[in-house]
Amino acid sequence: DAVKAKLYLTYTINNEGAVKVTQKMVADKSAEVSDMFRFGMQMQMPKCLDQINYYGRGPIENYSDRNNVTDLGNYRQTVDEQFYSYIRPQETGTKTDIRWWKQTNKGGNGLMFISEAPFSASALNYSIESLDDGVQKDQRHSELVPQANYTNMCIDKVQMGLGCVNSWGALPLEQYRIHYGDYEFSFIMKPIQSNL
């Protein structure tokens, strides 16, 4: 079945090359749609943009219902360090409560992401689809998932918690779920150069 919602995207570019991205989702109130996993954007960037510098929760991966053991701080990491080889391939590497995120090459050139409110982000050399094989799970292991030839970045207003608070299959607690409805998210992408 098709998703019953409208998504409006607005891109505003200033004279310095910064792009303000605003996405607004208007849900069909009559639709019966399950909870959403995330609300945000995904982009494929050149694989050479493999350096991460951000101010948010870290240094380990953390999610809305699993971030109380992480500290707010300024962290420098690589894209390779974001992937955790769980026994079964799955979502990994997300950071929460981010104030700003820089995705650059080793020379310091790339993009900076900022928003008016804290956001979540991740950067992996894997597509989301390669880490989640859908409802019917295959017998495979993380080390068998091939790397993509790009850096896959997700920048999210909100992402559902992991759940599993009383068993492996438990849904997240109510406050960490993303119910189908209207959402709006804006962020700014700014080009950064090491010589500026």
Task: Give the positions of each predicted feature.
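Beta-strand/loop-rich accessory regions of lumenal/periplasmic or secreted enzymes
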Residues: D1-L196
